[in-house]
Amino acid sequence: EKIPTVEVVLTILHAGGKFGGEGYKVSGGLHGVGVSVVNALSSRVEVNVKRDGKEYEIDFDHGHTKTKLHEIGAADHAGTKVTFWPDPEIFAETTVYDYDTLAARFREMAFLNKGLKITMHDERENTSEVVSGKAAEPRTEVFQFMGGIIDFVKYLNKGKETLNEPIYFSAENADGTVEVAMQWSTSYSTNSVMAFANNINTH
């Protein structure tokens, strides 16, 4: 029996395009195991796939396939939604996500991928442990930067006295793409240089 691609990606390590050499041109992450690890560390995962006018669903329980991929209805657009419940037996300290931590990462991803639109919905409310012990209200934040890393440099230098407009250049060959943006300011900081590979901060 042929296993659907979505099931392979969620249950087998190194099954992503990063290891095929020609799977995709741009990737995010380091090891190519991300979503399969999320599945392994979750008590439950639901995946909905919309394509070719139909919607499909597959369910997982503690990393194992619970319900095979099956059609559940019609779809008027394409896309994939992954919903996961972190396993409290593994993450004994907490399974509560901090809004500010997630927002910072999504903002960074939007800066690094020019034009990418990330919409963050936090539907939690009246839960004392959600945000640093303060009650949270439902909120939505959209991250999209058409200037890419030029906008990132401007964001990092907000409030500083800058000496020039951001300088930007890029280069591309068969092995990949390099982008550089820089701007001088009157302030000094040891964190003034940042580097990323596959959208990951290399510190």
Name each model feature, range by range.
Residues 9:
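Short basic (Lys/Arg) and small-residue
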